[in-house]
Design a protein with these regions (language model features):
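Glycine-rich/acidic phosphate-handling loop/turn and adjacent ATP-lid/helix
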Residues: 92-121
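A short, flexible helix-to-loop-to-beta junction within the catalytic ATP-binding CA
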Residues: 70-78
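Glycine-rich ATP-binding loops of the HATPase_c
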Residues: 128-141
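Short beta-strand/loop element within the Bergerat-fold HATPase_c
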Residues: 80-92
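Single conserved hydrophobic/aromatic residue that forms the stacking wall/gate
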Residues: 1-7, 11-12
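Conserved short strand/loop->alpha-helix "switch" segment adjacent to the catalytic nucleotide/phosphoryl-transfer site
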Residues: 15, 19, 42-61, 111
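Short beta-to-alpha transition helix within the HATPase_c
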Residues: 19-37
């Protein structure tokens, strides 16, 4: 399923993004947050059925990725805000790619911020996966691959 959501336009019905109910719940939360903050939200999901991966792991990894991305995109200039989620099951693995706009200046660290990537690395490692982090000039991309068996 592919979709692009700009502003408050919706092109899906009943918040069914893919075949996995946990993924659907997190994507619905992400879509609502993007609409609320006027972030251009796009996704491309190839998940035809319920994942074999532990639902708590799916929830933890995907919600960490998307919440961090929404928070970073919010700090971008209004005309440039975007968030893209791509995910697919290929063989015995789940691949997730989240890319978001980001400000060119690093935000000031606050007391409780800055642990998102550490938490994500731990979650991915515990699920026998790999993570690739690619900070770009005006964007930030995280690719995660975890076992789905």
């Amino acid at each position: 399923i592919s979709c692009s959501l700009v502003g408050s336009e919706m092109c899906i019905r009943d918040s069914i993004y893919c075949g996995d109910p946990v993924f659907n719940a997190i994507m619905g939360e992400t879509e609502r947050a993007c609409r609320e903050h006027k972030i251009d939200f796009q996704y491309d999901l190839e998940i035809p059925q319920k994942l074999k991966l532990d639902p708590v792991a799916v929830c933890s990894i995907l919600s960490n990725l998307t919440r961090n991305a929404v928070a970073a995109a919010e700090m971008t200039e209004r005309a440039e805000e975007f968030l893209t989620v791509k995910a697919a099951v290929k063989g015995d693995y789940l691949h997730i790619c989240v890319e978001n706009s980001r400000t060119k200046k690093a935000p000031k660290k606050t007391e409780r911020k800055g642990y998102g990537l550490e938490i994500l690395r731990d979650l991915v490692e515990r699920n026998h996966g790999q993570i690739d982090i690619q900070p770009g000039e005006g964007s930030f991309r995280v690719d995660v691959t975890v076992e789905n068996f």
